[in-house]
Amino acid sequence: MKKIFRLILMLIILWNIVQINIFSQEKTKKYNKIIPLTLNGDEMLLSLITDKSRLVALSGKIKKGKCPDELYNKTLKFEKVENNVELVIDLEPDLVLIMDWMGKDKISQLEDAGIDTFVYKTSRTYEEQHKLFRELAELVDEQEQGKKILKDMDERLEKLQKQIKEKSKDKASPRILLYSPIEETEGIGTLYDDMIKLIYGQNLAAELGLKGTGKISKEKVIDINPEIILIPVWGMHEKKGTDKLLNILLKDKSFEEVKAVKEKKVYIVAHKYQTITSQYLIDAIEMLGKEVYQLED
């Protein structure tokens, strides 16, 4: 009987030690009052931070109707700072995420207030986004959650690429042009260019030597004769109400000999997917792959 009692007592002591260690680990995280000032900062931290009490506020850039409801609903319980540096300082965070293009003045204000800042650049490739996410996971002590999310991204990319290879076996890479309603496209050094490479396509704007975002004339579109045209639409996360825009291009007489128009391979895509720099980049790549190769879900 005494042996059983001692065993039970030892188990209780061990359980308490484990709980104390877990509690201690949570309390010793370097940053526990975090605020992101960007859309992608909101997106990354909402998925990365397991204990949401460590998020003091969000940037407020995730808007209803411009993203899936599931993502928007995750933001409802948080205060939104909306680029108000004074409000950020009043909330007394110990870490603020801010992008380099937001300006040295804002960064200096935060640092002068004794707040640590994580200043980062816009990712231009899948690998750069991968690296950024790893660094952020390390910074906020969420390495395991970070590994889990990155593993999911890599597995989904591998699966998509396998589907594409199977469907396009023995076929040349599709010649693709992003062509906005204001005659803009994306060339060398853009995230979109890297996404097209990842789905084994040819970005015609890059092949023309265009760097970054730039204009492309209707005459040039006709001249390069793309096999697939992608039309980006602002604020769209679903394909509702886009038929009118599609028909404008399909019924344009000057485009009637363009291969993409003749074969009705003109597709509407959400503009957000050109510039998405969070773990949701994989959603954008999947969307592009499914549109370009007409893959089933």
What name fits each language-model region?
Residues K33-L91, L95-W101, G201-L204:
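A short, structured surface patch at a secondary-structure boundary
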Residues S59-I62, L191-T213, I268:
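His/Asp/Glu-enriched short active-site or ligand-binding loop at hydrolase and phosphoryl-transfer sites
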Residues I8-Q19:
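Bacterial N-terminal signal peptides
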Residues V85-E92, A113, K215-N225:
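Short helices/loops that flank or line small-molecule/ion binding pockets
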Residues M1-R6:
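Positively charged n-region of N-terminal signal peptides that target proteins for export
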Residues T28-K33, K106-S180, E184, A205-A206, ...:
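Extracytoplasmic substrate-binding proteins
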Residues T38, D100, I228, P232-M236, ...:
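Short secondary-structure boundary segments
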